[in-house]
């Protein structure tokens, strides 16, 4: 297994990206408004910022990955810009934001091209940005090249109104349960998955509990008919 020939801390373009995008401003620990909480974070206000597109050179081995992927896509009649929305280098990590209709082609090229060989997909994570209109749901795939000792991420977005993303099961079969979990918790529908059913919540569960718009629930207590209210409804002391 080869080692990268440059330390990412020395790479050009590794410090950040341009055109950062503010997708939300959260107040308090749970992002609720108009009510108190007992967490001690009731006065916390922070912007949720997503890094923007990075300019070339990306640094480290990232330029080589982009170039080899572009060549592979071109052989299949696909332009790099038609498949990749943006390339982000942030905190020494490479993320390719992929258009969802091109996800399977990009993943297969990354897996099969000898100079890329990202043989391992470590699963898929869901993210929900309710204020990012038209791109509220994100699926993030960490990839690892065992051959070349390299890492990158693929990120795909979909709107709440059309939460469909192609399944990567055909390219990375080990994503089977990971896609089921992301569907279970975020409601992303992975088209082409052989058995997209809930994997942790009961089959008749209503909603997807890791979405930001999912209501915070209280805890039923078995004695005296009491119920602990959800965090955003508790009395505040600040």
Curated annotation (Swiss-Prot):
Keywords recorded for this protein, A-Z: Cell membrane, Membrane, NAD, Quinone, Translocase, Transport
Gene3D superfamilies membership: NADH:ubiquinone oxidoreductase, 30kDa subunit
Leader peptide range in chain numbering: none
GO MF term set: NADH dehydrogenase (ubiquinone) activity; NADH:ubiquinone reductase (non-electrogenic) activity; quinone binding
GO cellular component, one term: plasma membrane
UniProt EC number: 7.1.1.-
Topology in the lipid bilayer: Peripheral membrane protein
Subcellular localization: Cell membrane
The reaction(s) this protein catalyses: a quinone + NADH + 5 H(+)(in) = a quinol + NAD(+) + 4 H(+)(out)
Main location: membrane
Annotated region (Disordered), positions in chain: 1-20
Origin superkingdom: Bacteria
Cited function: NDH-1 shuttles electrons from NADH, via FMN and iron-sulfur (Fe-S) centers, to quinones in the respiratory chain. The immediate electron acceptor for the enzyme in this species is believed to be a menaquinone. Couples the redox reaction to proton translocation (for every two electrons transferred, four hydrogen ions are translocated across the cytoplasmic membrane), and thus conserves the redox energy in a proton gradient.
Subunit field text: NDH-1 is composed of 14 different subunits. Subunits NuoB, C, D, E, F, and G constitute the peripheral sector of the complex.
Alphabetized HAMAP family for the sequence: NDH1_NuoC (MF_01357)
Entry's family note: Belongs to the complex I 30 kDa subunit family.
Name recorded for this polypeptide: NADH-quinone oxidoreductase subunit C
């Amino acid at each position: 297994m080869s080692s990268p020939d440059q330390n990412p801390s020395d790479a050009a373009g590794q410090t950040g990206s341009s055109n950062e995008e503010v997708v939300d401003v959260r107040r308090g620990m749970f992002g609720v408004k108009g009510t108190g909480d007992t967490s001690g974070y009731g006065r916390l206000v922070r912007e949720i910022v997503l890094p923007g597109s990075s300019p070339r050179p990306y640094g480290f081995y990232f330029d080589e990955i982009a170039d080899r992927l572009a060549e592979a896509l071109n052989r299949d009649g696909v332009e790099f810009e038609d498949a990749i929305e943006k390339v982000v280098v942030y905190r020494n990590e490479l993320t390719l934001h992929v258009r969802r209709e091109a996800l399977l082609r990009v993943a297969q090229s990354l897996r099969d091209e000898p100079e890329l060989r990202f043989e391992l997909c470590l699963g898929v994570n869901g993210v929900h940005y309710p204020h990012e209109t038209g791109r509220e749901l994100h699926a993030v795939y960490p990839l690892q090249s065992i051959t070349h000792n390299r890492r990158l991420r693929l990120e795909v977005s979909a709107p709440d109104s059309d939460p469909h993303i192609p399944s990567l099961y055909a390219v990375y079969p080990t994503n089977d349960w990971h896609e089921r979990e992301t569907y279970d918790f975020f409601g992303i529908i992975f088209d082409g998955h052989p058995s997209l059913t809930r994997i942790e919540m009961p089959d008749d569960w209503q909603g997807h509990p890791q979405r930001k718009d999912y209501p915070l629930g209280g805890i039923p207590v078995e004695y005296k008919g009491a119920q602990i209210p959800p965090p955003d409804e508790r009395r505040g002391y600040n």
